[in-house]
Amino acid sequence: MFCTRGLVFFAFPAGLDIEFTGLRSNLSGPQQISLFDLPSEWYLKTRQSVQQFTICQIGLSVFSAIEGEANKYTAHSCNFYLFPTTFGILDSEFSFQASSVQFLNQYGFNYNKFLKNGIPYMNEEQEKKIRHDILTGNWRVRSSPDKDQIKVVIDEVTRWLDLAKEGDWMTLPGITGFQAFEVQLVLRQALPNIWTVLKDEGVVVKKVSKQHRWYLQNTSCDRESCWKENILLSARGFSAFFQMLVKAQKPLVGHNMMMDLLHLHEKFFRPLPESYDQFKQNIHSLFPVLIDTKSVTKDIWKEMNFPRVSNLSKVYEVLNSDLNPTKNSGPEIVHASRCEKYVETKCPHEAAYDAFLCGSVLLKVAHLLLQKVHRIDPVPESSFPQYLDVLAPYVNQVNLIRAGVPKINFSGPDYPGIRPPILILSVKRWPGVSEQQVCHKFQNLCKFDVRRLTRSQFLLLTNKFKDARNILKEYRGHPTLCISLYRYWRHSPNVNCLLQVCGIVTAWALLAFTLGRSGP
C-alpha cells in the first residue's frame, strides 16, 4: 500500500475495482429495483444493500506517463484485502450472499486473506467515536475472545510483577496488530508501575517506578498522546489511503462503478445519507472527475460496429485486436516492476486486474475518440490532457443498471435517456392476477418490469426496443391480454378520475342552467 501512496499524486487516471460480500438484498415487491424507478428511488433501495454487505477486496491501478516517451504509460496495480475494524466499540455486522461467494470462489478469491489478514478501515463517524474514547480514557475492550485473552495476559503480568525488580522486563510473544495495541492500552491503564513497548517478537513489559512511568508518558518519543495517535492511525488502516486518494483529486476510473461509489461513501467517508442529492454532492466533492468505461464504451461500440461483448475483459480483448483501427498507434501500457503478475496471467474478477483493465480500456478508447476527431492516424503527440478533452461528454456520467434513467450525472441534474415506451396490459377473464404472474407469462418472450396500474391493468417496461416491438406484434388481437402503448392522458386513473369529476360538475352546471332558464 505504501509503495502506491506517492504515485497517486503523480499519476493520471487511477483505475478502481471493488469486490463485495454481496451485491443486492433479495427484497421482494416494491423494494426491488425497477426500470420504473427514478434515480432517487433506485438510490434508496440500493442504499439498504450497501449497508448490509461489505467490501472484501479493493483493486487500484495507477497509471503514470513515462518521461521522455510519447504516449507510453506505466501501470502500478495493487490488491488490498479489507476487513472492518474490530477495535474498542467498533464491531461491524455484515452479510454474505451465497451467489456472490460462489462467484468469487469460482475465480479463486482467497477468503482466508480477507478474514485473517484484511486491512482494517473505518469511516469518519466511526473514527470520531473511537478517537474520543481513546483520548479521553473511556476506551474498553468489547470483544469476548479479546477480553478472555487480555484477562490471561493481565494475570500473567501481575504474577510476574510480584517477583520482578525495577528494570526487569518480560515478553508477551505472538501478540500483533490491534490485539497488541489493546493489550498495551489495558496493561498501562491497569498497572501504574509498568511500561510497554511493541517489538517484532511481541509486547515487551518493563517494571518501572511511578516517577519513571510519569516521565515516559510525558517526555519520551512514546509518550501517551503520540502513542494513542499511532493506535488511531493503525485502526484507520486503508481509510488513510482513501483520504490520500481523495486529496490527490485525480480522475477515478471504473466500470459500472455505481456500487463502488456507494460503498466508498459508506465505508470510508460517512454513512450514506437519505438524500440522493446529498449523496451526489458528497461524491462530487470527493472525486470531481469520474469516468465510467461502461458509459464510454456503450457509444463507441455502436459507432465502430464492434461485436457485442458482455464484460470488461471482452471489451479489453476487442480493443487489443485487429478490429480496433488504432491498435498499433494507441497508447503503450507496461506493468511496473513488482506489479508484473498480469503481464502473462489473466485474473478476471481479481480487483487489481479489473482496475488495470479499466484504466487500459479508458486510454485506448480515448485514443480512438481522438483519432475520430482529428481524422488521421496516428494522432501526433497524443497525451492524457488531450484524452480528457475528448472524454469530456462522459465525465461524471456513471452507468446505472436497471433504473428509469441510463446514467447518473454527478456534476449536475440527471438527464432522461432514450428508452423504449411504456406499454399497458389490460387483462380479461383472469381474476386476481398478480405482477409476478404477469412477469412469468412473458418470461419466455422477453424480460419486462411490471407495475400494477388498476385491478386489471399493468404497466410493462423493458430496456430493449426490440422486446417492446416483439410483444406488441405477438399479442396483437389477443382475446384476453390486450397490449398497447401507454398514454398518460388516456390511461392514468388519476386523469380518468379528474375527467369524471369534471364531467359530473359540467353536467350539474348544465342541468342547473337549463332549469334556471325554464323557470317562471
UniProtKB/Swiss-Prot annotation:
Q: Which cofactor does it need?
A: Mg(2+)
Query: Has UniProt tagged this entry with the keyword Metal-binding?
Result: yes
Main localization of the protein described in the UniProt heading: endoplasmic reticulum
Q: Name one GO cellular component term.
A: nucleus
Q: Record-annotated residues binding Mg(2+)?
A: 17, 19, 260, 354
* Localization annotation: Endoplasmic reticulum membrane
Transmembrane region positions? 497-513
Q: In what way does this protein cross or attach to the membrane?
A: Single-pass membrane protein
EC number annotated for this UniProt entry: 3.1.13.4
GO MF assignments = metal ion binding; poly(A)-specific ribonuclease activity; RNA binding
Q: What enzyme category does the UniProt record give?
A: hydrolase
Q: Per the record, what are the reactions this protein catalyses?
A: Exonucleolytic cleavage of poly(A) to 5'-AMP
Record has Nuclease as a keyword: yes
GO annotation, biological process: nuclear-transcribed mRNA catabolic process, nonsense-mediated decay; nuclear-transcribed mRNA poly(A) tail shortening; priRNA 3'-end processing; siRNA 3'-end processing
Q: Which UniProt keywords apply?
A: Endoplasmic reticulum, Exonuclease, Hydrolase, Magnesium, Membrane, Metal-binding, Nonsense-mediated mRNA decay, Nuclease, RNA-binding, Transmembrane, Transmembrane helix
Q: Which family does it belong to?
A: Belongs to the CAF1 family.
What is the purpose of this protein? 3'-exoribonuclease that has a preference for poly(A) tails of mRNAs, thereby efficiently degrading poly(A) tails. Exonucleolytic degradation of the poly(A) tail is often the first step in the decay of eukaryotic mRNAs and is also used to silence certain maternal mRNAs translationally during oocyte maturation and early embryonic development. May act as a regulator of multipotency in embryonic stem cells. Is a critical factor for proper spermatogenesis, involved in pre-piRNAs processing to generate mature piRNAs.
Please identify the protein, giving its name as recorded: Poly(A)-specific ribonuclease PNLDC1
What species is this protein from? Pongo abelii
